Amino acid sequence: MLFPPPTPELGRRRVLGLALGAGVAPALGAGTASAAAPPARPAPVRPRADSPEQALGRRVATVATAQIGVPYAWGGGDRLGPSLGFCDEENGYLDGRCLGESTVGFDCSGLALYCWYRASGGAVELAHYTVAQYHRSAPVARADLLPGDLLFFSRPGAPLHHVGLWAGDGAMIHAERTGTLIARVEGVLDLPRWAGEFAGARRPLPVG
């Protein structure tokens, strides 16, 4: 097929099209080259691992938390868990009735003994006596408390009479007295009753 010769008007259109195409192509290329690279993702922050001391303390607090709701039993508790209590002078009685001899549970030092023995796999074995537990442990400043540390209490001019376990976040887990259940006390060292009798915190030492 024969095509008619190009007219002057058709020639002008071709020239204009070529000129426009030449101007657009570099602009498209420049835009592609200068596109911003996506921002780099920050490296994930890994939580700091607990020290062996912190890890043991957390296990102690976990064992203590699992005992919440277990009855108080005067003389109750050993390294195997809750045990039958007994009555001794004024201890173990409620309203003149001996509950200790019929209650399986923990008293305050029995709870501390069990939690530390269980959590440490037997590496920490405390006596079943608050004063002995105090002397078997190292002092800890209030600002340095870790879960599992022992909190001791006494009245003015009297020996130590109570021990509880620091649970972290200002709380203590303890076995208080006959007729009660093991419980968690929030803000314990800010409560007048407990703050007024606070005799210091201690951290048990491994055997050996």
Predicted features by range, described:
Residues 21-23, 33-34:
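Cleavable N-terminal signal peptides
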Residues 2-22:
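N-terminal secretory signal peptides and thylakoid transit peptides that target proteins
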Residues 39-109, 114-119:
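N-terminal capping segments
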Residues 2, 50-61, 113, 121-188:
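...with weaker cross-activation on analogous glycine-rich loops/strands in unrelated enzymes
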Residues 29, 34, 72-106, 124, ...:
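Glycine-rich catalytic cores of cysteine/serine-nucleophile enzymes that process amide/ester linkages
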Residues 196-208:
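Low-complexity, Gly/Ser/Thr/Pro-rich intrinsically disordered linker/tail segments
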